């Protein structure tokens, strides 16, 4: 299967550059993957498409202020993106510009040392005074909004590029499928008998890396660490045993669920599950855990688009995206959403 099979024309005007004026006021395109039928609705009406006994799994990660600008000795400005805290990679950054190992950078009155320059635009940094680099970014950094927005982060992004239930800091990109969740919608879902559970998955480096192969089978997927609490494991086991439906909110949640499926389904224990999801989901994959998927409209040739196609069916998804463009839906992180059921 070729990456080019997942290309399509996305008009620039269909990319939402800012969040909607009111959280939860976006549109929702509902796709029935059995019939291919499409229903035009609103994100705020999600509760009308779910039923008692369903389980909604949300990613409660919190986006950190991971973007920072520094100055080289030459006077050139360089953009730095601090990646997720993860064992020995805790001082890894993604950079845009030129860097050399051993050079010093200046930022907000502090000196940063470039310890090592790595492939794919990565480097290992440290504060020259031995301070905590993550604390430094938290104090001086800005919200790492996606580069395709083609603007700097603004005050509105501090609140709106974050979910209302964000709890555990660590992501450099938001779990965008749930950006339009509101307390009111979550309460209606609970009142209707829909169970709400959480997973913590810190969205990291892979969000910014393009596919560099022509064939899907040759692509090596990035890893994302996750923690599924014991109460969420128990809820998933109970719902599956009772014949209920698991609704994954977002592609990262989907990857983590499918990665942990053997441990969830083959065990009666309710212990927490921790892992690193490196699973690459594309058409032909057989889902074990996820029954419904709530997700955004994704960029051409992206791994998240391929995952969505695996869930919806390639022809169904192609037709749905064509309809969405025609009907003026907004795409990508701050845009509208799809429910695949």
Swiss-Prot record:
It catalyses: 7-aminomethyl-7-carbaguanosine(34) in tRNA + S-adenosyl-L-methionine = epoxyqueuosine(34) in tRNA + adenine + L-methionine + 2 H(+). One of its GO terms (cellular component) is cytoplasm. Keywords: Cytoplasm, Queuosine biosynthesis, S-adenosyl-L-methionine, Transferase. Its main location: cytoplasm. Pathway: tRNA modification; tRNA-queuosine biosynthesis. It comes from the Bacteria. One of its GO terms (molecular function) is S-adenosylmethionine:tRNA ribosyltransferase-isomerase activity. It is found in: Cytoplasm. Its EC number is 2.4.99.17. GO terms for biological process: queuosine biosynthetic process; tRNA wobble guanine modification. Transfers and isomerizes the ribose moiety from AdoMet to the 7-aminomethyl group of 7-deazaguanine (preQ1-tRNA) to give epoxyqueuosine (oQ-tRNA). Monomer. Belongs to the QueA family. This is S-adenosylmethionine:tRNA ribosyltransferase-isomerase. It comes from Chlorobium chlorochromatii (strain CaD3). The gene is queA.
